[in-house]
C-alpha cells in the first residue's frame, strides 16, 4: 500500500471538533478476547470405563488424530487464556467426553482445563481459594510462573515462589468459611445441579482453583523451555526492577 504525502497532516493543525472516527473503530472491544473461565466438571456418562480421564478415551479420538488436529487448529493456544504450549490438552466444550465432534473440541492448557474438571481433582491436588480482584486467567498465569520458579536453581527464587503459592492457597480458609469446604470435588456436585453457566459466573465469583504444583512438574519444565525461554528466571529480578522504576 502506498501513502499519498498530501494525506499526511500536521497533528497540531488538526481541528479536533471536526475529527470523525472511522466506522467500526473499537468494535473489536465489544467481544472479549477469551471466554470467561468458569468452574465445570465432566459429564457422568453411563458405562464410562475411564471416569477420571480428563481427555476423551474413545479409540476414534486418537485413531482419527483428533487431538493433534485440534491442537493445530488452535495454534496450540489455550482457548481460555491464550497460553501457547505443545503440552496443552484438549477440552470437550459440552463436558461430554463421548462427544468428539471436531466443533466440540478445543485446546486448553492444563491449569485452565483443570477448572473444567473439578470432579476429577482428588483431595490434595487442588483447593478452591477466594481471590477477589484476580481473574481466573491471571490466577493461572501466576501459578504457572510460580511452578517454573519452584524448579529454579536459585534457592531464593524457590523460597519466594513458595511464599506466593502459600499466600494463594491460604485463601482457601475464606472459601471454607463461606461454603463449608474448599475441596474441588465437592464443588463439582453443586455444578451438576447448576447447569446455567451464566449463573455459575455469579455464584462462584472471585473463587479460583489453586493447584498442587507437584502434579505439574513435567509441564513446568516444558513451559520453561517453550514460553519462558526468552525470559529465563534469572532475568526476572531485573525485569521487575525495570518495570517498577520505569520513567513516568
Named regions from a protein language model:
Residues 58-110, 116-130:
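Histidine-centered nuclease catalytic patch
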Residues 1-56, 114-248:
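Extended charged
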Amino acid at each position: 500500500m502506498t501513502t499519498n504525502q498530501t494525506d499526511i497532516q500536521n497533528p497540531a493543525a488538526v481541528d479536533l471538533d471536526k475529527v470523525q472516527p472511522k466506522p467500526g473503530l473499537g468494535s473489536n472491544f465489544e467481544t472479549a478476547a477469551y471466554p470467561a473461565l468458569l468452574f465445570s466438571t465432566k459429564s457422568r456418562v453411563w458405562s464410562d470405563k475411564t471416569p477420571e480421564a480428563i481427555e476423551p478415551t474413545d479409540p476414534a479420538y486418537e485413531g482419527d488424530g483428533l487431538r493433534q488436529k485440534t491442537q493445530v487448529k488452535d495454534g496450540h493456544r489455550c482457548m481460555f487464556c491464550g497460553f501457547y504450549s505443545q503440552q496443552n490438552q484438549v477440552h470437550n466444550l459440552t463436558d461430554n467426553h463421548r462427544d468428539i465432534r471436531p466443533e466440540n473440541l478445543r485446546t486448553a492448557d492444563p491449569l485452565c482445563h483443570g477448572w473444567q474438571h473439578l470432579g476429577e481433582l482428588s483431595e490434595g491436588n487442588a483447593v478452591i481459594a477466594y481471590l477477589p480482584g484476580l481473574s481466573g486467567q491471571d490466577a493461572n498465569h501466576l501459578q504457572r510462573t510460580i511452578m517454573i520458579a519452584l524448579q529454579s536453581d536459585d534457592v531464593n527464587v524457590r523460597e519466594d515462589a513458595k511464599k506466593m503459592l502459600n499466600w494463594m492457597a491460604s485463601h482457601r480458609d475464606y472459601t471454607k468459611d463461606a461454603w463449608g469446604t474448599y475441596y474441588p470435588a465437592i464443588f463439582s456436585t453443586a455444578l451438576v445441579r447448576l447447569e446455567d453457566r451464566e449463573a455459575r459466573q455469579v455464584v462462584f465469583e472471585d473463587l479460583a482453583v489453586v493447584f498442587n504444583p507437584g502434579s505439574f512438574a513435567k509441564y513446568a519444565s516444558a513451559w520453561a523451555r517453550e514460553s519462558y525461554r526468552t525470559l529465563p528466571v534469572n532475568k526476572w529480578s531485573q525485569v521487575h526492577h525495570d518495570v517498577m522504576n520505569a520513567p513516568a
